[in-house]
Swiss-Prot record:
Annotated compartments: Cell membrane; Endosome membrane
Gene3D superfamilies: Glutaredoxin
Transmembrane intervals: 16-36
Function as written in the Swiss-Prot or TrEMBL entry: Plays a crucial role in the metabolism of thyroid hormones (TH) and has specific roles in TH activation and inactivation by deiodination. Catalyzes the deiodination of L-thyroxine (T4) to 3,3',5'-triiodothyronine (rT3), 3,5,3'-triiodothyronine (T3) to 3,3'-diiodothyronine (3,3'-T2), 3,5-diiodothyronine (3,5-T2) to 3-monoiodothyronine (3-T1), rT3 to 3',5'-diiodothyronine (3',5'-T2) and 3,3'-T2 to 3'-monoiodothyronine (3'-T1) via inner-ring deiodination (IRD). Catalyzes the deiodination of 3-T1 to L-thyronine (T0) via outer-ring deiodination (ORD).
Catalysed reaction equations from the record: 3,3',5'-triiodo-L-thyronine + iodide + A + H(+) = L-thyroxine + AH2; 3,3'-diiodo-L-thyronine + iodide + A + H(+) = 3,3',5-triiodo-L-thyronine + AH2; 3-iodo-L-thyronine + iodide + A + H(+) = 3,5-diiodo-L-thyronine + AH2; L-thyronine + iodide + A + H(+) = 3-iodo-L-thyronine + AH2
Disulfide bonding pattern of the chain: none
Organism: Sparus aurata
Subunit (UniProt): Monomer. Homodimer. May undergo minor heretodimerization with DIO1 and DIO2.
Similarity-based family: Belongs to the iodothyronine deiodinase family.
Gene: dio3
Name of the protein in its database record: Thyroxine 5-deiodinase
Keywords tagged on the record: Cell membrane, Endosome, Membrane, Oxidoreductase, Selenocysteine, Signal-anchor, Thyroid hormones biosynthesis, Transmembrane, Transmembrane helix
């Protein structure tokens, strides 16, 4: 009895400590969402964000006037995303989490690192069809895939919906998809993604959302894994989700390969 009570107390204290650490950042995000419901402020903020974008790889985020930003569902989503980011096990320079996913076309369970091919970098692109920034930048991601397919491999990991139609709904989402109740729901949603990026490797997270949790991927996020270690960790979406950073990393990696080959030839 005493041991059980001690375990419960430890869990309660751990949860309380987590809440205290996340609270300042969460309150700041909540205030920002509240301010964004004033359309004059929303337009100014989006305009400033658009000015900071790095060309066609990162088109600006669009938020229609009809979308409510400060709601109970939005606060839940923000808290959930911040909690996943804080508790994630993926960190720059460390071993990449080898979580279970399912291949969409083959309907077969694999682990993320099974998709690596030798020493080639593996790019992980986490997102969902109900996430407007992710879908808006999907074309740019495909351009990167086609331009760097000779030196790297790419994997789209379909996670839980960012803006489900029965949650924090967004009228800017190209698809209105409810929360996934089973793996079949997630596979059906991923088929829509596959139609958007034909020929791409698409997998789905399991219903425990283990990949999403391990990589802190909600709402969307980019990672690069090489030699089973995280060598690039993108920021949390939407603000930190930048295809331009992915392109820059791959360009530097390609230049490094060319320089090493040139050095070998000179020797």
């Amino acid at each position: 009895m005493h041991d059980s009570g001690g375990v419960q107390m430890a869990r309660a204290l751990k949860h309380a400590a987590l809440c205290l650490m996340l609270l300042p950042r969460f309150l700041l995000a909540a205030v920002m969402l509240w301010l964004l419901d004033f359309l004059c402020i929303r337009k100014k903020v989006l305009l400033k964000m658009g000015e900071r974008q790095d060309g066609p790889d990162d088109p600006p985020v669009c938020v229609s006037d009809s979308n409510k930003m400060f709601t109970l569902e939005s606060l839940r989503a923000v808290w959930y995303g911040q909690k996943l980011d804080f508790l994630k096990s993926a960190h720059l320079g460390r071993t990449a989490p080898n979580t279970e996913v399912m291949l969409v076309q083959e309907r077969r369970q694999v682990r993320i690192l099974d998709c690596m091919k030798g020493k080639r970098p593996l790019i992980l692109n986490f997102g969902s069809c109900s996430u407007p920034p992710f879908m808006t930048r999907l074309a740019a991601f495909q351009r990167v895939v086609s331009q760097y397919a000779d030196i790297a491999d790419f994997l789209v990991v379909y996670i839980e919906e960012a803006h489900p139609s029965d949650g924090w709904v967004s009228s800017d989402a190209p698809y209105q998809i409810p929360k996934h109740r089973c793996l079949e729901d997630r596979l059906r949603a991923a088929q829509l993604m596959l139609a958007e990026v034909p020929g791409s490797n698409v997998v789905v997270d399991n219903m425990d959302n283990s990949s999403n949790a391990a990589y802190g991927a909600y709402f969307e996020r980019l990672y690069i894994v090489r030699d089973e270690r995280v060598v690039y960790q993108g920021g949390r979406g939407p603000e930190g989700y930048r295809i331009s950073e992915l392109r820059n990393w791959l360009e530097q990696y390609r230049n490094g390969l060319v320089n090493s080959q040139t050095a070998v030839l000179h020797v």
